[in-house]
């Protein structure tokens, strides 16, 4: 139910429901904690599905093989199943992180002061929207590019995990 709700509704709607809706029932949150809660719940839903799919991608025989060589259930999970699942899950989890970084601009809609909101304030004073929004886009692009490089490095490390050269 949780995953269905958070994957099936727009992030902006989730921000509004938590920030404005909870105040209607007496739960008052400042904008920043409300945004942190929503981003955490939203990303958690996507990450849960990614990890579930990655775990299901590991053949059942791997679990049986680990137990046949004398490993306990937990040893089999941590030494055999999870390393394989993480190789599968790492790229989509990294992509989710990159998307979340870009989605933080939505928090301006509940008055969280972040880069996009600051830019809107400057635009209101200078009447120079194009250049300023291009600069914000460039900053997001640079940050996303760095995260992509980190992702590729992590993928290479995970791909070589367990493969000893000899």
Regions of interest found by a model, annotated:
Residues 1-166:
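Transmembrane alpha-helices and adjacent helix-loop boundaries
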């Amino acid at each position: 139910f949780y995953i269905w709700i958070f994957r099936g509704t727009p992030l902006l709607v989730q921000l509004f429901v938590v920030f404005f809706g909870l105040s209607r029932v007496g739960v008052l949150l400042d904008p920043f904690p409300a945004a942190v809660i929503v981003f955490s719940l939203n990303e958690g839903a996507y990450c849960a599905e990614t990890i579930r799919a990655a775990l299901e991608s590991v053949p059942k025989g791997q679990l049986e093989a680990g137990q046949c060589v004398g490993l306990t259930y937990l040893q089999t999970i941590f030494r055999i199943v999870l390393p394989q699942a993480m190789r599968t899950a790492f790229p989509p989890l990294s992509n989710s992180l990159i998307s979340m970084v870009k989605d933080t601009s939505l928090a301006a809609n509940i008055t969280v002061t972040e880069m996009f909101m600051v830019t809107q304030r400057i635009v209101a004073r200078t009447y120079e929207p194009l250049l300023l929004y291009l600069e914000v886009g460039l900053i997001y692009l640079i940050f996303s590019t760095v995260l992509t490089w980190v992702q590729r490095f992590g993928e290479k490390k995970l791909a070589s995990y367990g493969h000893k050269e000899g």
